[in-house]
């Protein structure tokens, strides 16, 4: 089991660019580009940049598989701002987070490709998603709890983004751009699922 754990850890480091980020940040320190005190911040920033690039590349690749490239970009553009402030379910490791995100995008694009969303389906999905966001957001994590002020700020921003995206979605449907509107609709639906899962995860953690 120790060997398996070591292999998993090594895979996680490779996938999340930990070693490469460390090497680049140390080279900046050696050249005097940054101070030693800024090393950790620089390393984290580089790793986040690599992670964002990897996730974007993965999103585009999945979009190409389904023939829905611009839809994958629009979904991601609508989902990330909401996710940033609403919170929700978080995987225990960066590798799991990557694969869960890839699976979510694949499921969403499969729905866009193969499942029709008539008005009588879209309206209930939107209403349920809105109720869940208004009731649950923000959903914190056990290792990064939010204080009362942060909760108010995050809740306000999540609701504001939700309202703006709702107006954009309605406008797209009004212009008969149903596919684009459905991308935003499914970003809201995906977020509501993550909020519910995150709330369950937090409750389970507190009981453990």
Where on the chain are the PLM-derived regions?
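N-terminal juxtamembrane cytosolic/stromal segments of multi-pass membrane proteins
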Residues: 13-46
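Membrane-helix boundary/juxtamembrane motif in polytopic membrane proteins
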Residues: 141-163
């Amino acid at each position: 089991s120790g060997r398996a754990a070591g292999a998993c850890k090594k895979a996680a480091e490779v996938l999340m660019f930990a070693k490469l980020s460390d090497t680049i940040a140390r080279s900046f320190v050696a050249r005097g580009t940054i101070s030693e005190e800024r090393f950790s911040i620089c390393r984290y920033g580089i790793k986040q940049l690599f992670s964002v690039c990897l996730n974007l590349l993965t999103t585009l690749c999945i979009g190409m598989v389904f023939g829905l490239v611009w839809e994958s970009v629009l979904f991601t553009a609508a989902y990330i701002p909401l996710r940033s402030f609403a919170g929700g379910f978080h995987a225990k490791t960066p590798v799991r987070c990557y694969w869960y995100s890839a699976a979510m995008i694949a499921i969403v694009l499969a729905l866009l490709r193969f499942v029709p969303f008539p008005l009588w389906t879209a309206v209930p999905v939107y209403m349920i998603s809105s109720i869940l966001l208004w009731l649950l957001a923000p959903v914190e994590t056990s290792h990064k709890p939010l204080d009362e002020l942060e909760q108010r700020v995050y809740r306000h921003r999540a609701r504001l983004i939700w309202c703006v995206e709702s107006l954009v979605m309605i406008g797209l449907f009004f212009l008969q751009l149903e596919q684009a509107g459905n991308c935003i609709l499914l970003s809201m639906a995906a977020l509501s699922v993550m909020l519910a899962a995150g709330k369950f995860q937090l409750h389970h953690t507190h009981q453990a």
